[in-house]
């Protein structure tokens, strides 16, 4: 229905309309067939649903992980505790970091591993950075039916520069929140110059944990709607 702009796999291969890069008007597929173990970045003109038909993916499912950045699928009809899924990769020294489409992460802080994703959900893909190659196994015994964690409330005062989920996020991790005298409902934002590239509204849970992670969105290839690598980031509160 004219919503799709581009699809990209973890190797930066694309499926997009030829007119974006050439004089051709047909869609050009440099990805090939979609793979059940792979996730994909999808850019659309506005919010919409993608319906995929076919036979359900059989689990247990083994997903090959290579060193560096991977985009993995979650082709399971249900939800799973995210930390439980990736714990074997942590134990094996494979996992460096994993992010959801909004940039929330599971990563190691000085005080240990912090989980800001909570649950892997049906229909989602995840960006995984690995220290070395390995295999991630998704087991059916761990699947919960249709459970979704409560989403974080969007900020009211600060408005981020991008629409949707953002792109190629960086995480700004703030510790010792209680020493700053912030309260639940207060907002913290990250700025690249005058551009708000990420913001969160603090919750009681953030204050209990004394930490918060702010996903900030990178700029698009045209240099708009996100932070520019190498630029200083300023933190503001309200």
Could you tell me what each predicted segment is?
Residues 1-171, 175-187, 192-238:
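N-terminal exported-region signature
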């Amino acid at each position: 229905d004219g919503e799709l702009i581009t699809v990209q796999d973890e190797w930066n291969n694309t499926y997009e309309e030829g007119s974006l890069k050439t004089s051709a008007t047909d869609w050009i597929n440099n990805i090939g067939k979609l793979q059940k173990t792979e996730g994909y970045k999808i850019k659309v003109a506005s919010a919409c649903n993608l319906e995929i038909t076919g036979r359900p993916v059989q689990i247990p499912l083994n997903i090959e992980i290579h060193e560096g950045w991977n985009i993995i699928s979650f082709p399971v009809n249900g939800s799973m505790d995210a930390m439980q899924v990736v714990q074997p990769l942590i134990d094996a020294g494979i996992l460096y970091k994993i992010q959801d489409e909004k940039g929330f992460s599971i990563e190691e802080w000085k005080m240990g591993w912090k989980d800001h994703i909570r649950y892997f959900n049906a229909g989602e893909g995840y960006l995984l950075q690995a220290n070395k190659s390995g295999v991630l196994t998704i087991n059916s015994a761990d699947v919960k039916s249709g459970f979704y964690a409560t989403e974080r409330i969007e900020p009211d005062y600060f408005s981020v520069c991008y629409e949707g989920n953002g792109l190629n996020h960086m995480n700004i991790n703030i510790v010792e929140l209680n020493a700053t005298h912030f309260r639940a409902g207060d907002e913290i934002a990250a700025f690249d110059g005058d551009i708000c590239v990420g913001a969160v509204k603090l919750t009681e849970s953030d204050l209990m944990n004394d930490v918060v992670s702010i996903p900030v969105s990178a700029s698009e290839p045209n240099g708009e709607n996100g932070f520019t690598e190498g630029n200083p980031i300023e933190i503001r509160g309200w």
